[in-house]
Amino acid sequence: MEGVRQKCRPKHQVLVLKCYPQYQKGVQVVKPNSSELSYLLYYVSTRRSKLTKVGAFLEKRAARDVWRRKIGNVQVTLQILSALIEKVPRDLPIYARSVMTVLETVVRSQDISMVEDSIETFETFCRHQDMAALSAEQDFATQYREVVRSYAGFAEGDPSTQSKLAAGPPLTVRWKTAGLRAIKGVVSSEAGLAADGGDSIRVILPVILENLYSPEDNLVGSLELKLLEADKNESETAHRRRVSTATVETVDAVEGDASLAAQNTADMDRKAEMDMRLLALRCLEQIVVNGSSRGQIRVTTQVVLDFILRKSRVTGNGLGHNHKDSWATSLIELIAKWCPVQVRFIILVAAMDILHDIPPTEESLDESFAITYLIDRLLKSPVNMIGLSVIDVLLGLLRHMSFLISPSRAGKSTPDEKQNGHSNALELSVKRTEVLSLLQDCIGNLTTHIYYGEQVVDMVRTILTRFRPSRGNEQAITSSPTQSDVLGGASAMISSGEDGLIAFSLPNAKITALRAIKNILLVANTKRPGFTVTTESRHQVGLYVWEGTQWLLSEPDRDVRYAYVDAFLTWLNLETSTDDLKVKERTGRPASQPAKNDLSDPTERPGKRTASMSGNQREKVILIAQSNFLRLLHLTIFDLATDHPTSVSEITLLHLLLVSLVKHLGVNAVRFGLPMVLKLQDNMTTGDGQSFPALVNIGSLVYGYLWALSEKFDLDTSRIGNGIQSEVQKRQQLGVWLETIRLPPVNLDKIIHNSNVQASGRGAQDVSLLIPFDGGEELIQRIEASYGSFITLLTHSPPSSPGSVGSPPRSITAPVLPHVSASAATPKANVLPPAVREQMLSPWSREACLAAAENERAEAKSLSRSRTGTLVMRNHVHQNGTSSPSASSNASVPQSAYASAAGLQNAQRTSVPNSSGSQLISTSRESPVHVNELRRVLSVNEEGKARRMSPLRGRLDGSNRSVISSSSDSMVSGYSLSEFDDGASVKPQSTRGGRISLDGEETPKASALSFMADTNDIPPVPPIPPSISIQGGLTDGRQRSVSASRPSTAPGPRRPSVTNGKAGTPSTSPGRSLSRDKSRSSTGLAAAATDGVEPNAEKIDSARLDVQKLLDGFLSPADAETRGSRRKARSNTGRRGVSGGLGRPPY
């Protein structure tokens, strides 16, 4: 019967059965018969219909062998499946279910030997599996996940998935190793992880982390070193020399380990466990390295952070400030290091999402602290996260901080508290205070890596624009202008809704945010030797970011005032430089004051002024914001000194602030501070009802400020300086001086510590001893002289020199001062601007200060409207050429501070003004030629791109004849200072007649509408072809060229002098006609060209060659090289003879 049964079997079953060899019991490894297996593979590869039948038969065979515990037959079945997958991988979806069924049968056997044998087949399947089939067939996908989950259960140590005999540690490690080997096969296939949307990661990653977890802090670090060492050994083994066949080696010599041979079983168990953990780390590395998709990295990060939180809840060992390195921090930094650079920032984004999901209750503070601590470690680690949205992370941290402080979010508010508004209703616990302190550090560490130039500026401004006054300080806000809308007011910054408004009205929120600003400045100015130098150098945080925050100095809460002063003093110490000691005047020339050498007619000036003014609008708005802040800050100081004259701590704090302003800002602060201090003195001396301690304190504050001015501007040797020093010493000797007023001023920490200490006993209480200061005019003269000496020293010192006063150089790109090149060489630059001097001499009043602040705020708004109205419209007409960066702003972009946290309504960052580009000056009839026009037109070598201009040009009057000179000074005289304006980064096109020219900015064409203004005027003349010229004449004045690379001081070629529009010596020689591309003279004036006959190139004489060689020297090398290919002879006759071309053409 058996023979009959075998003959009745199908051929595929016969071929499969022939692969099983005859073996004896006790054999460890059984392999299929090689020849029969080869024939079976050939049979199924040529007959695809047999694949399903072979798979089904192997399923039955494996089930019977597993039930009978025939491990050898199971090994053969698994090897047949592996060979089948490698032979016909394209047809794997046909028999994939059979493979999964066999593996599932083996896994359920709970036999460690069978499970270990099945791993190789599973790895082969993972390498060749089809993701489309895995995603399309739900039943097959479910079966695949069950197999993966079974293997993960082995690695997890789940007793339900392991044999009951697995009682000893060696067998447990063996089970875990088997499971991790299978998991490595899953994670090694990038497609396998991405196919199921992260479900496999959620199954296997906790198992991997469980095998990596250890209370030891340095376990991950030691495993990483072993992993690197193992990779190095593998690479060395791969390149190992071949062993000679004559050398006889024993098995022990090849595979033995002498160190292991000398150890006991416990040591070997520890080594096996370490190898198991190392395998788990390899699996984690494969997940992270292969996670090129953002979704996969996000899922990985979420699973890791959830595991860390779960372990911290179970063990009770949370993270804290005293934990420098822990298992969790080492793991998260290692993952960030392995992660691909382009998706590394997803780790922080996922961590922020988890932080937002944690409720700000007292029970969840440990989780909030743990996630924030891990974020902080990532931010201050050497790992650079390119692509990270710093402002989004900052806003997320600020939002979480507001949730922690807000009573409603913390669940502590009552209906009565909601009706009474926000007070300090929420008492901060110790743990909540620790979380807030960690948030401060986390915000500061955001500046560890600089990703763009305006990063620090944007961060500081983002925080400052979110403050709201408390109920007791609303009068301080309503009585003074708030932040300028042009620089992005606070109202434009709030994006988190009502919660942000509530939280940032609380004193605790203000204190935490101000301390975070201090941390930002400290970290940004800290040099870390272990970090790589960033390619992006950051910009200096300007004074304008503090605009609208002066009311924080008058907050009812004392800690808020101290935190504000601390943050502002930190900015003064770290972000100011020598440039901040200079007085920065507003650039640009009013419309009623034309340039000294500007010879253009009135129709030409508005366009030029618009270009210049638009380029300087940013600087003007910044200067307005700076002056407004200093004006209102000194007004706040005046109010505080008037309201609290007897408070020693307040007067000392104001003295520290005033002295620091003078030290770091110089005349920029004195112009507002000196009139205010003198007014404060007048109010104290003329007011009635003032107590004697108040008079002493205010007098000490006034003379302390004058003392600081004397020290700052080196007035000790002058009469006014000696008088100030004498008065201070006399008051100190008589006991009518506040002891805390001294130079250098008292430290802020000492002021805070002694805030409740009152002044000691006074001396003789005689008001006549307090002599007021009355030498204001002489003091201002001495300050002006000292400032002039400082500017002179600074001008003649090297650029890298810090000057006489200033902070040491830092790695900050300072803003470019406008018009330095034009004004530094003139003696007038060493004199204090008249407006500043007049401001210091004029009397000060609170009403005038508020009115001036309101006027400047209105001016800033008008500048913003003009920029978004006219100039932005012009910025859209650049259709060709290279557009200026500042000219590419879009008028449709919302004017919000989040789009530009520095506050200016353009797409560029706003600290450093743009100075690139040259002006475009619109031309018209009756106007002389400007050299900038020549440079612009003739910078284009192609004839087709040359600007076409009408030859109509008015007769030159006597005022213009001085320009027509053949000397080297003629070109310099043709320039005006406005043409050297480096602030004209915006290049507007001509908009005459209400229409916009759509020509390119590099080669704009004259609009035809400019010649049609008056129909009764001279009719238009078509442009002369560039290839036609006349004998002895000059090319058209609109087409002459001066190379853009030619220096402005280069000598021009000699030409005959001109009198009354006629040339003294007519140039009618045939050899003296010039090409269109040659520059005639430094003024560039020429006669109109006429149509002519094709010239003869052989009639060029030596004189013409000499002139051409001379002109070639004035042009750039690129222009000179192209002259030979385009050089043509000129005609001997023309339509009209021209003897100089300086008059109006006779039509």
Swiss-Prot record:
GO (cellular component) term, any one: plasma membrane
Pfam families, alphabetized: EFR3 (PF21072)
Family from the record: Belongs to the EFR3 family.
Polar residues: compositionally biased ranges: 903-926, 1057-1072
Low complexity compositional bias, start-end: 883-897, 959-978
Name of this protein: Protein efr3
Signal sequence region: none
Comp. bias regions, Gly residues: 1137-1147
Originating species: Aspergillus oryzae (strain ATCC 42149 / RIB 40)
Disulfide bonds: none
Name of the coding gene: efr3
Region of interest: Disordered: 582-615, 877-929, 942-1097, 1114-1147
Lineage: Eukaryota, Fungi, Dikarya, Ascomycota, Pezizomycotina
Biased composition, class Basic and acidic residues, residue ranges: 598-607
The organism's place on the tree of life at top rank: Eukaryota
